[in-house]
């Protein structure tokens, strides 16, 4: 057992070596990215030892060996929880990151600050490892905030671009909203249970956990880009493609779902929170799938697809299947990271062109990338015996056989069908058909850094689902029995999506709209959500502020109180006081009459 924990710690410590190295002269070395990639690959290989031990023994462990501080009666110590979730997630994250780092060496080779880029990627990976192995909420919060700040730095990597800066700020602001929920939960546990240790929280028999669980759901909504706090994820595509592949597909965005999986002992008997999670996930998965249908930017489509899959994971947690949600996290990481890397390969080859309308015919010039992209898309849609099938098929079956909300189930099935539709659209427009890009572009994918990294994830996208689902069973799962039509639902829905997408792609190629349809506008403008939230709300508040500040105060009160009131009172008083009308003849006549009368009176008086 000592070997189990020490191997795991060794794997995590190896990752910190290049960070320490960055304070020496080696940081200026051109080989620094290579050191980082090698450290990650060694960490992955060493982390496989405890994972294999765990698979065969099934023994979870917690070790707490560094007392940090005591707050009144609560002891804060650094403790790691190596259970099913962290033991499987760590090797998956390390494997995906290793491939992405190798890909980055090709993609970012001309960047002058490539060493800093690799250091950021590694720091992100370390904070992610802290998050998944944490045994108390404080340590989990450190990892949670760590991935948030690294996300900000990496999205805004090209800080000379306004869009990148805006997207980075947007990601931070949306995540702050989620963090409010996390901090509220931490405060509740501190006040009511006087502990942040996960074991102590789980063994308490407090019936009313609604408030902290709502806080956790808000935190997960922010981090995992669920409906309401979702716009930051598509905007995050402004970052370099390796960042999109690592943070916004396989690791960081699943942190919110991972948080709910960690706290599932509190959620499993709470009907209210489960229903909320189910409905939120169902709305997200459908809404983002609809948005993905009409996008033209290849990275935007893949990012909306990520958001849709996160919604599906939330649905799985909502039907009380945390282990299944976790399996989907692991299988999704492989195919989604590969999809982003293939997109990056296409974008780089076409001189940074991201519009799928300006691609086409790439299967002839980029055969390896095309093959990988098609296999990744099929794995994502749940093609039988590829990675995605093992989790996605089970999720649909579990939803079909559980006493769930019929509305949520229906829209989840529709979203699953749409997954096939937008995946077909990418394949159809970007890879097949006639070339629509400039013939002057030189295309070359024969770089070992690119080929090897995608190849590893390609193998993962084919076999990982089978390996993870068959060699690692959390508990003895009883064999499910269900009618044939229910068993085939997931597959039927996916095939329906494929057929519809192909039919629509082929029939609408020559069609031209005289005016855009409202449905099309709804999808391409992302359901008007950014327009309303990012434009209408600030504009309304600014207009009201301006009206109250300038119109109400300046134009009305200040003018009326001082200049206008003074002149008004002056005019009134002068009008009242002076009866001078300027009639000289009349005044002279009255003066003469008065004089004559007075003289006459004086004369007669004598």
Curated annotation (Swiss-Prot):
Q: Which UniProt keywords apply?
A: Electron transport, Membrane, Mitochondrion, Mitochondrion inner membrane, NAD, Respiratory chain, Translocase, Transmembrane, Transmembrane helix, Transport, Ubiquinone
What does the record give as the reaction this protein catalyses?
a ubiquinone + NADH + 5 H(+)(in) = a ubiquinol + NAD(+) + 4 H(+)(out)
- List GO terms (cellular component aspect): mitochondrial inner membrane; respiratory chain complex I
Does the record carry NAD as a key word?
Answer: yes
A biological process (GO) annotation for this entry? Answer: mitochondrial respiratory chain complex I assembly
What family is this?
Belongs to the complex I subunit 5 family.
Q: What is this protein called?
A: NADH-ubiquinone oxidoreductase chain 5
Q: Look up and give the organism this protein is from.
A: Canis lupus familiaris (Dog)
- Read off the lineage from the record: Eukaryota, Metazoa, Chordata, Craniata, Vertebrata
Q: Which gene encodes it?
A: MT-ND5
